[in-house]
């Protein structure tokens, strides 16, 4: 673990991303290798640094959002550390609310720095 609680393995950093059904479908179409382009009005891509925070978002936000299909998935993936070194970690709340802010125009380069596949490690559904 580094000072931000994300796991590092050599030159890789493990990141997480909470997503809804539509975004997961688009990721699966890439062969679980890339995130889809941001939509208009979404200038930033937000991967998070720990599973706890990703789970919170997937469970508390995605499951209450019609655009997410009322389901939240937690994804795990590895990114080359030398690419991430160009971005600062942003703390957006509690000590676990840590994320990178990747400009939409850098998402293609971000995807090129993913090593391996994007894994679905959990899902949460609206129980109401």
Where do the protein language model's features map onto the residues?
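Conserved NAD+-utilizing ADP-ribose enzyme module
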Residues: 1-46, 52-128
């Amino acid at each position: 673990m580094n000072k931000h609680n994300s796991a590092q393995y050599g030159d890789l950093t493990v990141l997480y991303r909470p997503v809804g059904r539509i975004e997961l479908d688009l990721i699966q179409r890439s062969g679980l290798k890339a995130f889809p382009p941001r939509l208009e009005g979404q200038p930033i891509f937000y991967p998070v640094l720990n599973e706890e925070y990703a789970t919170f978002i997937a469970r508390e936000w995605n499951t209450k959002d019609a655009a997410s299909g009322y389901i939240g998935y937690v994804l795990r993936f590895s990114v080359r550390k030398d690419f991430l070194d160009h971005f600062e970690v942003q703390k957006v709340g509690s000590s676990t609310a840590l994320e990178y802010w990747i400009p939409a125009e850098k998402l293609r380069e971000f995807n090129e720095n993913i090593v391996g596949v994007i894994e679905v490690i959990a899902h949460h559904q609206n129980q109401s």
